[in-house]
Amino acid sequence: SVWIAGRQNGATESDCEAAVTSCVADYRQQIRKLSEEPLLQRWYERLDLERLSTTVSDRTLRAEIERSARRARTRTSDRALPRFTERRNGERRIVEEPPLITRLSEADAGQLAEALDEYLLTLPKQWRRLLAGYTLLDCAHKVVGVGSVGLRAYVALCEGSSPDDVIFLQVKQARRSVVARYVHGESALHAHQGQRVVEYQQALQTLSDPLLGWATINDR
């Protein structure tokens, strides 16, 4: 992703390689640092926007970080509603944008609906009770980021107490981690790859999405 971002911004291949090397080196250094900290301190370690801004010396990059943060705060379901949905025969539906967003077959849509029911059971009870009040209106296949190329990904539109009370749920296929072959013992065993992704994301993030969960579609 770092290399592709460099290309997109006009950097040379050698600069892209240097950026990737720097990122990997910093990642290894941070992992080593965390391994030496007390367990509780390691658990609550976080990198927020304020800390990130103070570690960046380049003024242009700092401004870009702040701009990206402001843009991220506007990415809510109510903002996405007019852009990604339309009224069709009196019902709200997801707008198709081939090849990025495409309609599912009736069979695939039915399997996704069943998977969402299964997904509810993996949520904490209070969130399961809340989300159970929403009704699935529509779903579609959606092309997502570079790291998910070749994997199945869907978006589901759900309605709550009114036509304006909507949420979008994203469903992404998870596969076995590339580092799993180097890990031994209990931590290397995961019966469900979606569960693995959710549990580790909850462990890595100080405040993770409370609606993270998992399900199975066609044995995936």
Model regions: which residues?
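Conserved ATP-binding subdomain of kinase catalytic cores across diverse folds
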Residues: 1-74, 117-220
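Long, low-complexity segments enriched in small/aliphatic residues
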Residues: 46-114
